[in-house]
Regions:
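Short, solvent-exposed secondary-structure capping/transition elements
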Residues: 89-93, 114-120, 139-144
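Active-site-adjacent structural patch at catalytic or cofactor/ligand-binding sites
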Residues: 82-113
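A general secondary-structure signal for short beta-strands and their flanking turns/coil
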Residues: 74-76, 97-103, 158-164
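Acidic-leaning, charged glycine-interspersed low-complexity segments
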Residues: 121-173
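Small/polar-rich, solvent-exposed N-terminal microdomains that initiate assembly or binding
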Residues: 2-92
Length: 173
């Protein structure tokens, strides 16, 4: 038997592309960029951030991998990405060998001293924006991204709080 050569990339081969598309969407959102960049209560009332300035958040407040910076003494807000559970796509008891599905995780958290903003709780505002940007949208994998999980996230002895939220991405194997 010979293995059939496939054309195109699998979902796992495209993970890097998916993550960069996700981060570009996040950094393109003035709401997320302001909540990440400005630690003040009036973060959303600040002037819009220039595109090149939003990309300066990469690897300082935004990370394309699951990374928790050593932030115990530093106040700030952070957004990181992770992946989990990539597998053959299954619906009910039927498994589809031609497709893969998995979760893209957003981890975002903020120091307890800067959670409050003039417009609400910082991580709640971020959650609403991430949901708006990704839930039910297309452009990553085939079909729509679908909300999979949402869990509260507390780290560094409860000095930082936020959420872990995941969306299912499905693509060809």
């Amino acid at each position: 038997l010979t293995k059939q050569i496939k054309r195109g990339k699998s979902a796992m081969e495209k993970l890097g592309e998916y993550k960069m598309e996700i981060l570009n969407r996040c950094l393109g959102s003035q709401t997320l960029a302001k909540l990440l960049k400005y630690d003040s209560e009036d973060a959303l009332d600040k002037p819009d951030i220039e595109m090149e300035d939003t990309f300066s958040l990469m690897h300082t407040r935004v990370f394309p991998y699951r990374f928790v910076p050593n932030t115990i003494d530093e106040q700030g807000t952070f957004l990181t990405l992770g992946v989990n559970g990539f597998r053959r796509y299954q619906e009910g008891f039927q498994v589809f060998d031609d497709y893969q599905a998995g979760e893209i995780y957003f981890y975002f958290f903020t120091h307890v001293d800067i959670m409050r903003t003039d417009h609400g709780v910082r991580q709640d505002l971020m959650l609403a924006e991430i949901s708006k940007l990704f839930d039910g949208t297309k452009g990553i994998g085939m079909g729509e991204l679908k909300l999979r999980y949402l869990n509260e996230l507390w780290i560094h002895n409860n000095k930082f709080g936020g959420y872990a939220v995941s969306f299912t991405v499905t693509d060809f194997k």
